[in-house]
Amino acid sequence: MRSKPVVIGIAGGSGSGKTSVTNSIYEKFKGHSILMLQQDLYYKNQSHMPFEECLLTNYDHPLAFDNDLMFEHLEQLLRYESIEKPIYDFKLNTRSEETVHVEPKDVIIVEGIFALEDERLRDLMDIKLYVDTDADLRIIRRILRDTKERGRSIDSVIEQYVSVVRPMHNQFIEPTKRYADIIIPEGGQNHVAIDLMVTKIQTILQSRAE
């Protein structure tokens, strides 16, 4: 009988370095059986809404995410079943009609600002991480990402950060830190923490293979 996959949850504020940590762990297992499940792709489908209304969506609130679908997909992957992972179009502010076929793997990384917010998702995780990074650095990273990758202006990113992102972080994201098994400061630059995580994952995999 095949052993259960190892699930790692990686949470933290926008621009904290979650993706860097995720990519670092992924690279360490390159060539092995590992996949990434990005919460950013699981924003709720808004294709039925006018574009102007979609622009008002608060993407930093827990209710913006389709956690029901993410939970369903994670359960399928834990049963070694394939899924059709959604694609989110950040320029159109809605879910794409296309999907990505994903085969199950032995290691699953769930990454997102609210990766630890939903109890159902947490209960499926073997290791829960929170990436803790200074707020000034997080806003700089967010500006760079949203202007380059999501077609946003600098002014709109800053306005959104002050009016939405920062208060949502303080109210909803920061409190999920208490659910973390490990808190990683300085994101992807903390190579010691990442190496320790890789060792822990390998230990769990070996124990389940015995």
UniProtKB/Swiss-Prot annotation:
Pfam families: PRK
Domain of life: Bacteria
InterPro entries named among the record's database cross-references: P-loop_NTPase, PRK/URK, Uridine_kinase, Uridine_kinase-like
GO molecular function, one term: ATP binding
Reaction(s) this enzyme catalyzes, per UniProt: uridine + ATP = UMP + ADP + H(+); cytidine + ATP = CMP + ADP + H(+)
Ligand binding (ATP): 12-19
EC number, UniProt record: 2.7.1.48
Enzyme class label: transferase
Keywords for the protein's UniProt record, in alphabetical order: ATP-binding, Cytoplasm, Kinase, Nucleotide-binding, Transferase
Main location: cytoplasm
Protein name per the record: Uridine kinase
Organism whose genome encodes this protein: Bacillus pumilus (strain SAFR-032)
Gene behind the chain: udk
